[in-house]
Swiss-Prot record:
CDD domains, alphabetized: MFS_GLUT6_8_Class3_like (cd17358)
Naturally occurring in which organism (per UniProt): Arabidopsis thaliana
UniProt keywords, alphabetically: Membrane, Sugar transport, Transmembrane, Transmembrane helix, Transport
Protein name as annotated: Sugar transporter ERD6-like 4
One CC-aspect GO term: membrane
Subcellular location: Membrane
Free-text function comment from the UniProt entry: Sugar transporter.
Coiled coil: none
A GO MF term: sugar transmembrane transporter activity
Segments crossing the lipid bilayer: 47-67, 90-110, 116-136, 147-167, 179-199, 202-222, 285-305, 321-341, 348-368, 390-410, 426-446, 452-472
InterPro entries linked: MFS_dom, MFS_ERD6/Tret1-like, MFS_sugar_transport-like, MFS_trans_sf, MFS_Trehalose_Transporter, Sugar/inositol_transpt, Sugar_transporter_CS
Length: 488
């Protein structure tokens, strides 16, 4: 059966094939040769899917390393290159600018060359960007490297959650989807840890490693079966799905469900911006954009990018060590969320997370406000400093339990297959634009008023509670096709 009869599609698929098959072990596995006994190696579907997720997780690790790099290196880079606070703020935020450009292209790239091909393309500017930073003598190479990193990360941030959602069985999709954000936090923690001991130029060279490992790893995993089905590559689609579910698993029901979904989408004309006004399109897009925007407006990236500055203003002497401690806490909390998301559900974790962030940020804001009226030599000042640090850590924990991993997961789940490229690009672009806005203003807002900055973030998190309770659907335990049917 072919999902598309257009002859031009066959020509396009010929161009895509190098991204699909070159060196892919699943092509050997599909032959089930007695010599290789591939089915014995990957019989357990959970092992097969987990292996794929762990390989693509190198992309989010790169994402996190980019986010975490600017915090431990601020003092050294500004000293070595003679940068002002404003110039370093520009450097810190330029990854977001590059990511916006990458986000615009991400949907179309992932739709044309597939999820694997998209990640291969994203890895190249990341590698070049890190090398540019490591050899920078002035702001030009520094800024160029940060932009290139951002471009690659913008593509990664869309492609990885979509790929994971499309390969994961419904019972594991929440946990596996949360691995995306868990990997981001691991990347951040590694940047914080290595930043304690390694000069900033060497740290930039180490930033090359995730994508350097990702490129060969992609040759050993199958392409997304849903993307293959959409492209009309029927044999490849069924082969990929069989490998992901195990060679002894009956995939007939899932194959037919995906075929029906793709056939239904293929009957519709290409979606344009004007078509997004229909509820089946605008509502999931609104939910996806809303969650991803509120994730950033809550200030988490501002806190992470400039955590050393925040701890210094709180009176912590070893601010970089404290920042690494926050990174460890973030990894642990995100790991807990990964375990809970398919048990407790998405909505409950989002509610707990946003409420916890609101309370934590209010505590931090009050502590900073009160410090203005207390002598720096008093015990009360030290107590308030510790309260503000505890509040920041509590905010990071709360975010990691829900608002960190789940918005990307829900975005990858709720967007209809025929608008996923367009709508996913829009949602990812808005996320990175707001991230840039928060990152660009965080240092200046903290210099203006630490208490005022955290008050603004707290108000946003309070609104997030309302947004989740009114508009975010529960997707736990549903197939992607069942989720999309909710909006019809």
């Amino acid at each position: 059966m072919s999902f598309r009869d257009d002859n031009t599609e066959e020509g396009r698929n010929d161009l895509r094939r190098p991204f699909l098959h070159t060196g892919s072990w699943y092509r050997m596995g599909s032959r089930q040769s007695s010599m290789l006994e591939s089915s014995q190696v990957i019989r357990d579907s959970s092992i097969s899917v987990l292996a794929c997720v762990l390989i693509v997780a190198l992309g989010p690790i790169q994402f996190g390393f980019t986010c975490g790099y600017s915090s431990p290196t601020q003092a050294a880079i500004t000293k070595d290159l003679g940068l002002t606070v404003s110039e370093y703020s520009v450097f810190g935020s330029l990854s977001n600018v590059g990511a916006m450009v990458g986000a615009i292209a991400s949907g179309q790239i992932a739709e044309y060359v597939g999820r694997k091909g998209s990640l291969m393309i994203a890895a190249i500017p990341n590698i070049i960007g890190w090398l540019s930073i490591s050899f920078a003598k002035d702001t030009s190479f520094l800024y160029m490297g940060r932009l290139l990193e951002g471009f690659g990360v913008g593509i990664i941030s869309y492609t990885v959650p979509v790929y994971i959602a499309e390969i994961a069985p419904q019972t594991m999709r929440g946990a596996l989807g949360s691995v995306n954000q868990l990997s981001v936090t691991i990347g951040i923690m590694l940047a914080y840890l290595l930043g304690l001991f390694v000069p900033w130029r060497i740290l930039a060279v180490l930033g090359v490693l995730p994508c350097t490992l990702l490129i060969p790893g992609l040759f050993f995993i199958p392409e997304s079966p849903r993307w293959l089905a959409k492209m009309g590559l029927t044999d490849d689609f069924e082969t990929s799905l069989q490998v992901l579910r195990g060679f002894e698993t009956d995939i007939t029901v899932e194959v037919n469900e995906i075929k029906r979904s793709v056939a239904s989408s293929s009957k519709r004309s290409a979606v344009r911006f004007v078509d997004l006004k229909r509820r089946r399109y605008y509502f999931p897009l609104m939910v996806g954009i809303g969650l991803l925007a509120l994730q950033q407006l809550g200030g988490i990236n501002g806190v992470l990018f400039y955590s050393s500055t925040i701890f210094e203003s709180a009176g912590v002497t070893s601010s970089n060590v404290a920042t690494f401690g926050v990174g460890v806490v973030q990894v642990v909390a995100t790991g807990i969320a990964t375990w809970l998301v398919d048990k407790a559900g998405r909505r409950l974790l989002l509610m707990i997370s946003s409420i916890g962030m609101t309370i934590s940020l209010v505590i931090v804001a009050v502590a900073f406000y009160l410090k203005e009226f207390v002598s720096p030599d008093s015990n009360m000042y030290n107590i308030l400093s510790m309260v503000s640090v505890v509040g920041v850590v509590a905010m990071v924990i709360s975010c990691s339990l829900g608002m960190g991993p789940i918005p990307w997961l829900i975005m990858s789940e709720i967007l209809p297959v025929n608008i996923k490229g367009l709508a996913g690009s829009i949602a990812t672009l808005l996320n990175w634009f707001v991230s840039w806005l928060v990152t660009m203003t965080a240092n200046m807002l903290l210099a203006w008023s630490s208490g005022g900055t955290f008050t603004l973030y707290a108000l946003v998190c309070g609104f997030t509670v309302v947004f989740v309770s009114l508009w975010v659907p529960e997707t736990k335990g549903k197939t992607l096709e069942e989720i999309q049917a909710l909006f019809r």
